[in-house]
UniProtKB/Swiss-Prot annotation:
Binding site residues for a 1,2-diacyl-sn-glycero-3-phospho-(1D-myo-inositol-3,4,5-trisphosphate): K268, L269, G270, A271, R290, Y301, R311, K349, N360, H361
Coiled coil: 13-56
Name listed for the protein in its UniProt record: Cytohesin-2
Chief location of this protein within or outside the cell: membrane
Organism phylogeny: Eukaryota, Metazoa, Chordata, Craniata, Vertebrata
Keywords, ordered alphabetically: Cell membrane, Cell projection, Coiled coil, Cytoplasm, Guanine-nucleotide releasing factor, Lipid-binding, Membrane
Organism: Bos taurus (Bovine)
Residue span, SEC7 domain: 54-241
Amino acid sequence: MEDGVYEPPDLTPEERMELENIRRRKQELLVEIQRLREELSEAMSEVEGLEANEGSKTLQRNRKMAMGRKKFNMDPKKGIQFLVENELLQNTPEEIARFLYKGEGLNKTAIGDYLGEREELNLAVLHAFVDLHEFTDLNLVQALRQFLWSFRLPGEAQKIDRMMEAFAQRYCLCNPGVFQSTDTCYVLSFAVIMLNTSLHNPNVRDKPGLERFVAMNRGINEGGDLPEELLRNLYDSIRNEPFKIPEDDGNDLTHTFFNPDREGWLLKLGAQAPSPPSLPGGRVKTWKRRWFILTDNCLYYFEYTTDKEPRGIIPLENLSIREVDDPRKPNCFELYIPNNKGQLIKACKTEADGRVVEGNHMVYRISAPTQEEKDEWIKSIQAAVSVDPFYEMLAARKKRISVKKKQEQP
């Protein structure tokens, strides 16, 4: 018994030393806790003093406005509600649109999400927001650059459709006579956005030339063709300078992986692409354990759970999933391209030296630890697999133009 503390008599010298170290560390922690308590008490006193001196209504208003912006960035609807309830924003489409258009301290992804909602107020705000853009005497690419920089386009097809429809109506109103209908403007706008992706996405190897871009847009002007000079100017503008897309979180991918649809350890088989004739035997396919994260219609895999950057990214766009039997591993499934004619899956991976290269898979074969986990992964991936909404909406709008033309024919 030492200083009122019981000490077993049969301790070895090493155990006594370890016990003494624990007691000493405990005492240090108690001292540290007391110091933190005193610092916290001082800080609270300072805060209370500051609040007591904040008699300025302007200062209080600014604090509430900053709080409202933060709330908007986390939940746009609740943020607007907070600002309206605190009389910082009038509950009219015009005032809300002006607040979003100025965008001070606002997350552009949150702006896009709010504008894309289908509720009556949101739709009115969308049209008021678009009306704040001045597109007069701008060509279509210039107008799109301005429009797409003011918010981040959401991923849902229905939201994109409403926003691009509003853009087309505004552009045609500002530039009467350029296109015969808003449908033409709508279709060409999507064609330009797709061209931007094709020309500047490193994963797209087949870069469309001017002739293909012109051919792609034949007959979209109420059944007629647009002037080739107009299409050439749009093509050159995109080729020379890609769209600048707002990135609220910079290049840090960490934010992407918050609240994923699913995550866990899986085994991934090496590249499935056939070897070139010049390389007999090809590379040996091996199974590698990777940490997979499913989010935002993409499958990311990491070497370790603590890695900030993924080793590979597999966009699920236009892919399908199926169960497969493998003699070497149980609980397998595959990602593949339906009706595949030899093309590789659009994906990328990071080599050991840091280089980012295109994936070399015609299929991705993956093994889960258990049957139950395999079923859950398949279910989650099936829910995330998407068909590019641009192609779906373009096809629907082109069909509408074609039907309209046939109806007008005698």
